[in-house]
Amino acid sequence: MRRMGLLLMCLVILTACAALTVGREFPAPAKDTIRNGVTTKAELVRLFGEPTQVGIDDGDTTWTWVYFKHGDPQLTKQLQVRFTDRGVAKSYSYSSNFPEDMRTLK
């Protein structure tokens, strides 16, 4: 019984130390990947996978892709696309603190 409790406690500690991720990894969009007034929802799904979140902002449909990796340091990237009534990109924003993005986007 005591051994089982010790084993359970070790498993809890090891699980707490594991890296936590939220969302799916997706590539940073190149500057010409998303073209306002041209890029469709289907193209975005092909490029980045299904969005993590969907919503409405000031009457426009929005899709958001989020990837969070807990560790030291904590890393986050987010892509948000706003759509026209026709379902094409109206505007988008991308932010990240991943080292590779920090180097290429600065």
Residue ranges with predicted function:
Residues I13-A16:
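C-terminal motif of bacterial Sec signal peptides marking the signal peptidase cleavage site
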Residues M1-L7:
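Bacterial N-terminal signal peptides that target proteins for export
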Residues A18-K106:
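Residues within mature, well-folded domains
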